């Protein structure tokens, strides 16, 4: 009997990224730290916590997660206002305050007070970059999971792969960090039966990049969402992954496995492919 079949999978640790702005700074730092650990995390972003009411609401969500999980949530915070940070610190989570950890010691070292403008732009170049990122985020959200075929010509990359192979988080990471307009489309059994890519993608095949994943890991992830379903069954996961990889090879699509890769590593590979493509244009 397989020992892996009997081994219980530890529940994902809940992580909150809290900010009185977009939360991108807290999330970026948090991701960099969390990727050092070979564990699963349930990540929740709470942006624009800029009033006491919102801070107390965040406090309730953190404490609810503690009661539900039976373990302390981890909190990455860039709350600038002390009164808001004080409320969140009363939670039952482990609090990682980026302001207190980094900004306050630098204030002492430099002998000046910070402007307390985490995430704000200081130059016209920064403003343009911020605008590009927001546009990319909106594009990625509008084109998540095959929601829309509109304006695909604007996409920098189109990710394809079976459901839960990492397309959505990769798309959003590319948008938030690099201003990359990334659409993503699931490859589903109907596509395998037709032996064709989802409708509307053939015209943009040069923009497509595929993500695959080991079937056993895919089954684990899907069972967290729909335990005991055909969708999450290992046999079905093997079928979908095999068919998706066959399709990508048949269509000449570049692809990689996301099984052991962090979002940062996947994104770096895609960025390299995009830059290489632009150099050859």
From Swiss-Prot:
EC number: 2.7.11.33, 2.7.4.28
InterPro entries in the cross-refs: Kinase-pyrophosphorylase (IPR005177), PSRP (IPR026530)
Keywords: Kinase, Nucleotide-binding, Serine/threonine-protein kinase, Transferase
The keyword Kinase is assigned to this record: yes
Reaction(s) catalysed by this chain's protein: [pyruvate, water dikinase] + ADP = [pyruvate, water dikinase]-phosphate + AMP + H(+); [pyruvate, water dikinase]-phosphate + phosphate + H(+) = [pyruvate, water dikinase] + diphosphate
Pfam families (alphabetical): Kinase-PPPase
Residues bound to ADP: 161-168
GO molecular function per UniProt: ADP binding; ATP binding; phosphotransferase activity, phosphate group as acceptor; protein serine/threonine kinase activity
NCBIfam families xrefs: PRK05339.1
Family per similarity comment: Belongs to the pyruvate, phosphate/water dikinase regulatory protein family. PSRP subfamily.
Function (record text): Bifunctional serine/threonine kinase and phosphorylase involved in the regulation of the phosphoenolpyruvate synthase (PEPS) by catalyzing its phosphorylation/dephosphorylation.
Protein name: Putative phosphoenolpyruvate synthase regulatory protein
Species assigned in the record: Herminiimonas arsenicoxydans
């Amino acid at each position: 009997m397989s020992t892996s079949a009997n081994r219980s999978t530890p529940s994902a640790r809940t992580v909150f990224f809290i900010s009185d702005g977009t939360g991108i700074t807290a999330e970026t730092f948090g991701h960099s730290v969390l990727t050092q650990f070979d564990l699963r995390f349930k990540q929740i972003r709470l942006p624009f916590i800029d009033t006491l009411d919102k801070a107390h609401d965040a406090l309730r969500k953190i404490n609810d997660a503690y009661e539900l999980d039976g373990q302390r949530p981890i909190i990455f915070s860039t709350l600038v206002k002390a009164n808001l940070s004080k409320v969140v610190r009363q939670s039952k989570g482990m609090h990682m305050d980026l302001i207190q950890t980094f900004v306050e010691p630098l204030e002492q070292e430099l002998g000046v007070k910070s402007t307390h403008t985490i995430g704000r732009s200081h130059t016209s170049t920064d403003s343009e970059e911020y605008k590009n990122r927001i546009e990319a985020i909106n594009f990625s959200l509008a084109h998540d999971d095959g929601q829309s075929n509109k304006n695909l010509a604007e996409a920098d990359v189109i990710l394809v792969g079976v459901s839960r192979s990492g397309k959505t988080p990769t798309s959003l990471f590319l948008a938030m960090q690099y201003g990359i307009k990334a659409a993503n489309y699931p490859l589903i059994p109907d596509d395998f039966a037709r032996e064709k890519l989802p409708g509307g993608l053939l015209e943009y095949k040069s923009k497509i990049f595929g993500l695959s994943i080991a079937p056993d890991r895919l089954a684990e992830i899907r069972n967290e969402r729909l335990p005991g379903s055909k969708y999450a069954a290992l046999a079905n996961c093997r079928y979908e992954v095999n068919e998706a990889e066959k399709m990508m090879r048949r269509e000449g699509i570049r692809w990689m496995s996301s099984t052991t890769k962090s979002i940062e590593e996947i994104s770096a590979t895609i960025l390299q492919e995009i830059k290489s493509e632009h150099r050859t244009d």
